[in-house]
């Protein structure tokens, strides 16, 4: 399912399983967008400087762009309200 340029952190597996099928469809589309254009999301600021966030409906995807290695690491896929509580 994942493109060669996208790397998914192991911790995301549980988050993925917690999503409903319609949410997974949104995430799949969002991951394709991120793969096509990693800066499509918004850069985050302290204390998360260096990370990016992309919204897909109520889902927030947090990722890091590894420019020199030419890949993107997906660090979190969660409902936006859950992300705010972390």
Regions flagged by a language model, labelled:
Residues 1-6, 11-28, 55-59, 64-86:
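Enriched for short, Lys/Arg-rich terminal
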Residues 29-55:
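A short, surface-exposed loop/turn module that caps and links secondary-structure elements
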